[in-house]
């Protein structure tokens, strides 16, 4: 792996959230960043963050409401992995009237990262074959960073997240990074831990460096 230690501040000792400004979103830089607890946000210029505290999920403690559980059990949908990665990213970026950090540069760069086996999507299709929801993120070793989620059909994004968690647990993932908390992730059970603890857990989770290879359709 290419060494970018001269570009990024060391998050173990740097006490600010922005650890670098500029650079590019090349696969090599993204891989180094995620393995060291760093992620990009915005692209004019690119700002690289390592937040303290850090938002994470416990894979065994996703909060599922009774209403959502009924929808999951009704199975009026089809789940796939990595069938429509770029489409999922574009759907996550589609926020009429709002700004989005998922720009064309991010879409192009993460799609390339996906082709190399590090970025993944989960798609939730309705009974007519329409893409109703999905999630995308980055997987390295036993670590997954959830980047964004969308729902064009009510709760389909949450259904996708539920099945993503099931797949990650099956493959023995140990850390799910949600970066920062928002009202959706809070309601689903995300919580914060100190950066120091996050980096310790991350080091163990990414140690194998293996690529995740989920089946295209597993449910």
Swiss-Prot record:
Gene3D superfamilies: Leucyl/phenylalanyl-tRNA-protein transferase, C-terminal domain, Leucyl/phenylalanyl-tRNA-protein transferase, N-terminal domain. GO terms for molecular function: leucyl-tRNA--protein transferase activity. Keywords: Acyltransferase, Cytoplasm, Transferase. Its main location: cytoplasm. InterPro entries: Acyl_CoA_acyltransferase, Leu/Phe-tRNA_Trfase, Leu/Phe-tRNA_Trfase_C, Leu/Phe-tRNA_Trfase_N. Transmembrane segments: none annotated. It catalyses: N-terminal L-lysyl-[protein] + L-leucyl-tRNA(Leu) = N-terminal L-leucyl-L-lysyl-[protein] + tRNA(Leu) + H(+); N-terminal L-arginyl-[protein] + L-leucyl-tRNA(Leu) = N-terminal L-leucyl-L-arginyl-[protein] + tRNA(Leu) + H(+); L-phenylalanyl-tRNA(Phe) + an N-terminal L-alpha-aminoacyl-[protein] = an N-terminal L-phenylalanyl-L-alpha-aminoacyl-[protein] + tRNA(Phe). GO terms for cellular component: cytoplasm. Its EC number is 2.3.2.6. GO terms for biological process: protein catabolic process. It is found in: Cytoplasm. Belongs to the L/F-transferase family. PANTHER family: LEUCYL/PHENYLALANYL-TRNA--PROTEIN TRANSFERASE, LEUCYL_PHENYLALANYL-TRNA--PROTEIN TRANSFERASE. Functions in the N-end rule pathway of protein degradation where it conjugates Leu, Phe and, less efficiently, Met from aminoacyl-tRNAs to the N-termini of proteins containing an N-terminal arginine or lysine. This is Leucyl/phenylalanyl-tRNA--protein transferase.
């Amino acid at each position: 792996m290419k060494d970018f230690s001269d570009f990024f501040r060391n998050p173990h000792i740097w006490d600010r959230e922005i650890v670098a400004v500029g650079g590019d979103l090349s696969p090599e830089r993204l891989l180094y960043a995620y393995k060291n607890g760093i992620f990009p946000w915005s692209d004019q210029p690119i700002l690289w963050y390592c937040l303290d505290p850090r938002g994470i999920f416990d894979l065994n403690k996703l909060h599922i409401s009774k209403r959502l559980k009924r929808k999951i059990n009704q199975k009026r949908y089809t789940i796939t992995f990595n069938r429509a990665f770029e489409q999922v990213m574009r759907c996550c970026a589609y926020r009429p009237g709002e700004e989005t950090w998922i720009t064309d540069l991010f879409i192009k760069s993460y799609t390339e990262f996906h082709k190399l086996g590090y970025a993944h999507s989960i798609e939730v299709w309705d009974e007519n074959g329409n893409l109703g929801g999905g999630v995308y993120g980055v997987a390295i070793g036993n670590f997954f960073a959830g980047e964004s989620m969308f729902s064009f059909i009510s709760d389909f994004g949450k259904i996708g997240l539920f099945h993503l968690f099931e797949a990650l647990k099956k493959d023995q993932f140990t850390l799910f990074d949600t970066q920062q908390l928002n009202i959706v992730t809070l309601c689903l059970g995300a919580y914060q831990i100190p950066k120091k603890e996050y980096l310790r857990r991350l080091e163990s989770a990414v140690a194998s460096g293996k690529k995740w290879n989920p089946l295209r359709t597993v449910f």
